[in-house]
C-alpha cells in the first residue's frame, strides 16, 4: 500500500506541473513576440494537455483521485525567469515519470510513463533552446 501511495503522490505532483503549464500557457504565449519561440511554447502547451490526461487516467486506474492543482501565475512576465523555472519543472517531471515507471507493476502504465519521460527529455532540450534564443535577444 505504501508503494501505491508513493506512486500516486508522484503522479499527482507531475500532474500539477503539467496542469500549471496548461493554465499559464495563455499568459506566457501572449508575452512572446518571436514566432519561433511562440511555436516551441505551443508544442509545450499542447503536449502538457496530453500528459495531464494520461496522468489523470493513470491516477484513476490506480484507484487514486487526480488532484487538479496548479502553481500560481508569475507576478511579473520575465520570460528568462519563467523559462529557467520551466526548465527545472521539466527536469522534475522527468524524474517523477521515471520514478513512477520504476515503481509500477502494470506493463501498459509503465510503457506510458516511460513514453512521457522520453518526451520530457525533448522538452528539456526545447526549453534550453528557448532560453538560448532569449539570451540572443529574441522573445
Annotate each language-model stretch with its function.
Residues 1-139:
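Iron-associated oxidoreductase/ferritin-like identity signal
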